[in-house]
Amino acid sequence: SSAASDVYKRQHTQDMVMNIQNDLKDNQMPLLLQWDERWGYRYYGDQMMAINGCGPTCLSMVVSYLTQNGRYHPYYMAQYSEQNGYYSQDGTSWSFMIRGAQACGIDAKQLSLDENLIKEELMQGHPIICSVSKGIFTMTGHFIVLSEYKNGKIRVLDPNSQKKSHYYSFDEFSNQIRNLWVYSRNSF
């Protein structure tokens, strides 16, 4: 039984470590990665978070940043998604991007694909999540976060890649965007 209690202890310690409060130290949105060892090996549906956890990880970045609450880590969001029917074999459903945020007290709405609108929202401190298709960030489908607009460029946080998380011009990836959602601490 000592092996079982070791597993329990390790699991329990891991749960304690999953809180991302320390990632929220500065005034900038944290880049959280779906394959982070704190949650990457946990299951989301029939795959590990490292493989298919981009949706919950993006929403975690947005919600934890806007609330400054570290309990909304990627695995928390993944569990919420799965338990409430937002996960299917195709991945995370688009409705989760609004309902999941609302469940954490954050207002969310769909946004049109328009550079000026995107710039306006980001300048007001409203982060954006995009569903993207094949292109810079993915071979299939993926979610990314737009967190800032600076010097004519948009800061992208890619939950699957530190290397691809930097500033882009709108034209570099706008043709890959399938849908957008924008988030605010207060109601729109």
Model-found features: residue ranges?
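Noncatalytic regulatory segments and standalone regulatory/sensor domains
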Residues: 10-27, 32, 149-188
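Alpha-helix boundary recognition
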Residues: 82, 102, 122-123, 174
